[in-house]
Amino acid sequence: ELDFEAVMSSQQRLQGIFGSGSPWPKSDMTLEENIASLKVHKQEFALRQAFAYSVFNKTKNKCLGSVYIDPSDSPNYQCVVHLWIRDDSIELDHELFQTVRKWLQEEWRFSNAAFPGRYFEEPKPAKKVKSTVECQLPRKD
């Protein structure tokens, strides 16, 4: 419910965060639809295909936003990251962005992360990697 409240409190600004063709979040999205979406994120996380994180305040009684780490379709980027902060905490947006960039570089060892609509790391020469069906993100336990 905390995630749903955060999404709906910022629904208009979040429209198009995943690209102009994405309908998320719909203005009439229900709690049940939100829960179904969270279940998909949980399954993707378990399968190591993509990683979604909720961002909470210190007391964990308010969801402030989310971070989504997905595989990149481009060989120039190791991952694609979308993140958002709810409208009433928007002053934390830049801090979250900088924290996530640093975390990906230092802990995940991602040197080329794309942040659509925000920032793209300068592409480095792509390394040849074995093509697999699932995302090959470093394991973070």
Whereabouts are the PLM-identified features?
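ATP-dependent phospho-/nucleotidyl transfer catalytic cores
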Residues: 96
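Phosphate/ribose-recognition catalytic cores of enzymes acting on nucleotide-derived substrates
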Residues: 93
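GNAT-family acyltransferases
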Residues: 1-88, 99, 103, 107-141
